[in-house]
């Protein structure tokens, strides 16, 4: 049996919901080469027919049944997509009927409705959080009074992408502080962070993985040397333990999981956008 399987994330909006759920499902299966494609703004019958043709063509090309993760809210669009012969995984369908029964009200299948529930205030909060993350990246700005969280780690341990994810998806003002050679030499919490203990969260990483990442950026240097990576990670982990800073290894952990752990550990209650 072929290990290649085409997967399409189809939506009448951006496709982020379908792709996020689909990715979470696919990660449960190893040994497959999932060829993914996102088809966004499929919001009328003509676009749905074109999408179905693309899905069908992929099935013929790979000689295997495609998978469609579908978040279109209009049942008619879903029916057209199903004509492709793909395995249809509808994001909303399993929940709509029980909700209709519970609420004693029919749903309104308005295209794009599920993607238009974010008000201006929420949008403004997200943009402000993103600007904050960028201006407080890698220790650029050290005024952390307005920060919701400060990620602390050695260089290239995953601080920046986690901060950006927290900003975009939760509106969290996330700053990050890179542990410098001086910080690591002292093996103590840097003075500029001591007034913000309740906001600190440490990220650690397997030294071998850290070396791989650093080699891509600065190959064959002291910065990317195996001994340097082992030393920095060991000191950072001792510091987190000594200073009682909660921490998490990013080695085999997704950004989504890291972000969720940060929020729950620091007691930050925010709904996902």
From Swiss-Prot:
It catalyses: [pyruvate, water dikinase] + ADP = [pyruvate, water dikinase]-phosphate + AMP + H(+); [pyruvate, water dikinase]-phosphate + phosphate + H(+) = [pyruvate, water dikinase] + diphosphate. Its EC number is 2.7.11.33, 2.7.4.28. It comes from the Bacteria. ADP binds at residues 153-160. Keywords: Kinase, Nucleotide-binding, Serine/threonine-protein kinase, Transferase. It holds the Pfam family Kinase-PPPase. Transmembrane segments: none annotated. One of its GO terms (molecular function) is ADP binding. It is an enzyme of class 2 (transferase). PANTHER family: PYRUVATE, PHOSPHATE DIKINASE REGULATORY PROTEIN 1, CHLOROPLASTIC. Belongs to the pyruvate, phosphate/water dikinase regulatory protein family. PSRP subfamily. Bifunctional serine/threonine kinase and phosphorylase involved in the regulation of the phosphoenolpyruvate synthase (PEPS) by catalyzing its phosphorylation/dephosphorylation. This is Putative phosphoenolpyruvate synthase regulatory protein. It comes from Xanthomonas euvesicatoria pv. vesicatoria (strain 85-10). The lineage of its organism: Bacteria, Pseudomonadati, Pseudomonadota, Gammaproteobacteria, Lysobacterales.
């Amino acid at each position: 049996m072929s290990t290649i399987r085409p997967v399409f994330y189809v939506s009448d909006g951006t496709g982020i919901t379908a792709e996020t759920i689909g990715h979470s499902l696919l990660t449960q299966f190893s040994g497959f080469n999932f060829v993914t494609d996102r088809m966004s703004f499929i919001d009328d019958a003509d676009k749905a027919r074109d999408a179905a043709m693309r899905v069908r063509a992929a099935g013929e090309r790979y000689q295997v049944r495609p998978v469609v993760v579908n978040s279109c809210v209009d049942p008619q669009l879903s029916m057209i997509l199903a004509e492709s012969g793909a395995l249809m995984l509808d994001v909303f369908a399993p929940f709509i009927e029980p909700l209709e029964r519970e609420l004693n009200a029919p749903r309104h299948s308005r295209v794009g409705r599920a993607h238009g529930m974010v008000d201006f205030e929420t949008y403004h909060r997200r943009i402000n959080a993103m600007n904050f993350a960028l201006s407080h990246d890698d220790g650029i700005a050290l005024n952390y009074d307005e920060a919701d969280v400060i990620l602390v780690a050695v260089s290239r341990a995953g601080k920046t992408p986690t901060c950006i994810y927290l900003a975009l998806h939760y509106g969290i003002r996330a700053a990050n502080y890179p542990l410098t050679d001086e910080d690591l030499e002292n093996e103590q919490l840097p003075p500029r962070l001591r007034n913000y203990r309740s906001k600190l969260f440490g990220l650690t990483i397997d030294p071998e993985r850290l070396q791989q990442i650093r080699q891509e950026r600065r190959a064959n240097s002291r910065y990317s040397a195996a001994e340097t990576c082992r030393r920095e990670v060991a000191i950072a982990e001792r510091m987190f333990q000594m200073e009682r800073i909660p921490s998490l290894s990013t080695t085999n952990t997704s950004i989504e999981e890291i972000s969720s752990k940060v929020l729950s550990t620091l007691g930050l209650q925010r709904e996902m956008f």
